Amino acid sequence: WGFYLLLALVVVSLLAVVHYERFKVVHRLAPVIYLMGWVHGLCLLPRIGVLTPVGLTLLVGGGLGAMGAIYSLFGRVGQNARRQGTVSTLTPLDERTLEIRVTLTSPLSGYRPGQFAFFDFAGRGEPHPYTLVNVSADCRTLTLAVRALGDHTHWLHQHLRVGDAVIVTGPYGAFALPDPAPALWVGAGIGITPFVAWLEALVRRGETRPGTTLLQCAPTAEAAPYHSRLAELCRRAGVDYRLHLESERGRLDLAALGERQHTPVWFCGPEPMAHTLDAHLTAPLHRELFRFR
């Protein structure tokens, strides 16, 4: 039964039929279910034979899996990347976007611009991933932007206060600043944040990116986070900055954009936009798969 329960969890995970917050609770049972199945398998070893291929796989492979399950049960996953900190400033960027600055007691290690980290605010035990919009030179001051899109983000907007404790785990992610080459960067909504991180890093290093265009998509100028800052950063980094506002120019024609684009595209934003771009692009498309199941 343990095997079938574990298999059911895998199917539910792949199909994403359960809301993430509920799935997260169920997912915590996976190590327990795995250990139950492995112990049951060990009870059958005398019949199977320890030195048979199945027996050795169960003993060695299953044992390694059991070690991982125990490691997870004791909360050791990501512990070396965990940092303590406090909320130092809260700055509303618009009606739905809150910029949060966090000061850590010890620096992040291995950070690359564009990566994200998990933030657990006010000891709620609910770590959520947010892009690191900016990281100070000593990697002790982190900036993130939170858009009020769900229950957790609405709670942060309403209840988070300066001085609240934060646990930060990370950084993670492969959507890091690429090597210099002509490219199109497209950020939609709050998906603009990794590009802010890239540009902040370029300006800090004194680097430029000629031949690169940044396209920011937003409903209105008021709902376009960091657009003024981006214009200045792009000017200093030699990047062509374009702001597409739906209120003025209508919805961006992603199909046409994809068909005429011949340089690599780096995209961060809503999944439907990514799928449309991917369907019409002949050039490579790079994006962070910001899903965890």
Model-derived features: positions:
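Ferredoxin-reductase
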Residues: V77-I167, A183, P210-T213, C217-T220, ...
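FNR/FR-type flavoprotein reductase catalytic core
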Residues: W1-G78, A148-R293
